[in-house]
């Protein structure tokens, strides 16, 4: 049995307020992976999720059955993503000895002009508008099915 009085609710919401950005960032990563996998729906995905070891963390590492590798970083910040972030992700891939077919960034606030100019087959950039399009064009039961598969 748990009692929730006025004081405990005050501390709960104060604690939540401190951690809200972390929670939101985690949800943003999950939704980013969902969007990536939705866009790769014609491929057979054999593995998708975050990768980390003692030295390297990659937000999303997706591998298809034909051994195509996709790496993605999710940035829930108030800053735009610039080419420095691309270089950091490329360095992580070199250290892991992987050669992604595509590098992907998901951003809350958008991208530098330099990064936007490099967008193409090897580099995909997604903003909040892309999530809105996913929700508008996808049936909710498809999203839910993909979320729990």
Regions found by a protein language model. Give the residues of each.
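A cross-kingdom feature that marks ATP-driven nucleic-acid transaction machinery
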Residues: 1-149
């Amino acid at each position: 049995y748990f009692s929730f009085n006025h004081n405990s609710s005050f501390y709960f919401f104060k604690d939540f307020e401190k951690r809200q950005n972390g929670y939101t960032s985690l949800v943003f990563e999950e939704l980013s992976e969902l969007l990536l996998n939705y866009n790769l729906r014609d491929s057979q995905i054999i593995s998708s999720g975050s990768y980390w070891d003692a030295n390297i963390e990659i937000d999303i590492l997706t591998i298809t059955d034909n051994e195509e590798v996709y790496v993605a970083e999710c940035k829930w910040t108030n800053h735009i993503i610039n080419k420095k972030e691309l270089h950091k992700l490329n360095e992580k891939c070199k250290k892991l000895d992987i050669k992604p077919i595509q590098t992907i960034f998901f951003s809350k606030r958008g991208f530098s002009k330099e990064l936007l100019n490099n967008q193409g087959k090897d580099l995909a950039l997604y903003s909040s508008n892309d999530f809105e399009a996913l929700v508008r064009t996808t049936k909710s039961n498809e999203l839910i099915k993909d979320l729990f598969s």
